[in-house]
Amino acid sequence: MKIKKFTAASMQEAALLIRKELGNEAVILNSKKIKKRKWFGLVNKPAVEVIAVLDQDFLEKKTPQKAAEPKQTLKTPVSSPKIEERTYPPQIPAQQELGDFSAYQSVLPEPLRKAEKLLQETGIKESTKTNTLKKLLRFSVEAGGLTEENVVGKLQEILCDMLPSADKWQEPIHSKYIVLFGSTGAGKTTTLAKLAAISMLEKHKKIAFITTDTYRIAAVEQLKTYAELLQAPLEVCYTKEEFQQAKELFSEYDHVFVDTAGRNFKDPQYIDELKETIPFESSIQSFLVLSATAKYEDMKHIVKRFSSVPVNQYIFTKIDETTSLGSVFNILAESKIGVGFMTNGQNVPEDIQTVSPLGFVRMLCR
């Protein structure tokens, strides 16, 4: 995609310049009248300033349509909201491949500049920002422009399309065994207690706890406290055999919530021990717990480490402790796995919620 600003004495002259440089398939994105200075700034000559765009990738993919509406030609500029008259900085290149935001920001119409600013604040990857802006530009050309009111909605729609489909989100607790795993400090134990409390207090289910976190005494004591508050039994399992015995002990229960050890995600032994202790089967609903405060590269590494373990959904914790959900978006955009829950505080069971793809994107763009 190429975008270029042209200055000419008339629209007819501008159209000729556009055809000459970008070809007949170029589309006018915006136009306005300006005063062109001559003779050392003493004479202001009327002129027009036109922004045109050529989307070669789109043209290659486009298929002919028999009953299609005639496309807007270069003789008729795309209608768009009135943009204030201003001069453009001379350092901005006349023609720019759509890749570097800063290089062409000032030639975008106001609605698209608003979207660009919003994208910059999300923290998502640069390549995603660029592709999203390309799609917005393409839509603006086809739709005859975007307004301040509808540009954010279209932006959110484009971002939603990059995420796993809605049917992979908000999956309710339905299996007998609910297993949470992830790296240390992600908040697994507190999140497990929230899910268990909701299941018991709101769904009136009979619940029990199992923990395989035998590395930290504090973790066992923390879960024991929650179990006592909910008057639910707790079993500590060191081996696969003990886990099987606990399953038999809790055979009459509706849901059994399983806590696991939080270890350094760089340690491959942790994953092996997890699979040795817990037999992942159809009766188990498993969640990979990730902290929203983690860096994208670390989060990506964690997801890769756990790729050998069946993961039904993600749980993202600590969304109240970060100013940007860009890392979360980046992970989801690269994954086929949806989000089961998000947590936003330490209160049990209040600070946990389900979220849809659109709901998450709205959080991202707030």
From Swiss-Prot:
InterPro entries: FlhF (IPR020006), FlhF__GTPase_dom (IPR047040), FlhF_N (IPR055157), P-loop_NTPase (IPR027417), SRP54_GTPase_dom (IPR000897). Transmembrane segments: none annotated. CDD domains: FlhF (cd17873). Residues 64-85 are annotated as: Disordered. It is found in: Cell membrane. GO terms for molecular function: GTP binding; GTPase activity; identical protein binding; signal recognition particle binding. The keyword GTP-binding applies. Necessary for flagellar biosynthesis. May be involved in translocation of the flagellum. This is Flagellar biosynthesis protein FlhF. It comes from Bacillus subtilis (strain 168).
